[in-house]
Swiss-Prot record:
This is Steroid 5-alpha-reductase DET2. Disruption phenotype: Brassinolide-reversible dark- and light-grown defects; small dark-green dwarf plants with a limited leaves expension due to a reduced number of cells per leaf blade. Small and less elongated seeds due to a decreased seed cavity, reduced endosperm volume and integument cell length. Delay embryo development, with a reduction in both the size and number of embryo cells. Its main location: membrane. Involved in a reduction step in the biosynthesis of the plant steroid, brassinolide (BL); acts at the second step in brassinolide biosynthesis in the 5alpha-reduction of (24R)- 24-methylcholest-4-en-3-one, which is further modified to form campestanol. Can use progesterone, testosterone, androstenedione and campestenone as substrate. The gene is DET2. It is found in: Membrane. It comes from Arabidopsis thaliana (Mouse-ear cress). GO terms for cellular component: membrane. It is a multi-pass membrane protein. Keywords: Brassinosteroid biosynthesis, Lipid biosynthesis, Lipid metabolism, Membrane, NADP, Oxidoreductase, Steroid biosynthesis, Transmembrane, Transmembrane helix. It comes from the Eukaryota. Its EC number is 1.3.1.22, 1.3.1.-. Pathway: Plant hormone biosynthesis; brassinosteroid biosynthesis. Belongs to the steroid 5-alpha reductase family. The keyword Ion transport does not apply.
Length: 262
């Protein structure tokens, strides 16, 4: 009976993730989360960005520690290997990235992160963290699927690593530029910035595309689609922001997030 209830709960959570994407994309076409270059007043109290990132991303780590040991595949080396890229990404996002923000030392008075937005992100990470951890540790049933598991894992891992490299190096460039300009904004140049305004978002989408291939599941596909629904509208808004701010100086050949396409 408990197994049936757990499976029903998992399915409802998965459906929530999958169907949350389209309305999120529509909403973010008209309203951008007020942090970073889109920061604005009227969203209530704020907190230091490093603290916000640490707290709102943290469920991906501690929830995994709580859930994973109780899965049917918790001790399966393949499940542990499969989940490692997810944990590596979120260790960086929860620990390393906030530390990098903290060390950047640019003035933070006008750059507070709204607690309401952090709370929404925290809630999403609770939902998605549960889905991904529970799927890999308990509901995935093709670990013994011969060589297909390894083909999907290797191909997905190559895609994931490529995306993570683009994401991390682009984030590092943005943090460095903001530090050098005392919290101000300049036109990012070099690398993937020559092709798109937001290569950090492009890289993250590529990561979760690789994750979808590795997991070969609706859980992975749902995460990838929601990532695109969340980040691509923001990338488009950031692209327009750059053009409005820098006008003729901004490279006209750059796209928003997908090279040569969008």
């Amino acid at each position: 009976m408990e197994e049936i209830a757990d499976k029903t709960f998992f399915r409802y959570c998965l459906l929530t993730l999958i169907f949350a994407g389209p309305p999120t994309a529509v909403l973010l076409k008209f309203l951008q989360a007020p942090y970073g270059k889109h920061n604005r007043t009227g969203w209530g109290p704020t907190v230091s960005p490093p603290i916000a990132w640490f707290v709102m991303e943290s469920p991906t780590l501690w929830l995994t520690l709580l859930l994973f040991p109780f899965g049917r595949h918790a001790l399966n080396p393949k499940s542990l290997l499969l989940f490692s890229p997810y944990l590596i990404h979120y260790f960086h996002r929860t620990i390393i990235y906030p530390l990098r923000l903290f060390r950047s030392s640019f003035p933070a008075g006008k750059n507070g992160f709204p607690i309401t937005i952090a709370a929404l992100a925290f809630t999403f990470n609770l939902l998605n963290g549960y889905i991904q951890a529970r799927w890999v540790s308990h509901y995935k049933d093709d670990y013994e699927d011969g060589n297909w598991f390894w083909w999907r894992f290797v191909i997905g891992m190559v895609v994931f690593i490529t995306g993570m490299y683009i994401n991390i190096t682009s984030d590092r460039t943005l943090v460095r530029l903001k530090k050098e300009n005392r919290g101000g904004y300049v036109i990012p140049r070099g690398g993937w910035f020559e092709l798109v305004s937001c290569p950090n978002y492009f890289g993250e989408a590529i990561e979760w595309l690789g994750w979808a291939v590795m997991t070969w599941s609706w859980a992975g596909i749902g995460f990838f689609l929601y990532t695109c629904s969340n980040l691509f509208p923001r990338a488009r808004a950031s692209h327009k922001w750059y053009i409005a701010k820098f006008k003729e100086e901004y490279p006209k050949t750059r796209k928003a997030v997908i090279p040569f396409v969008y």
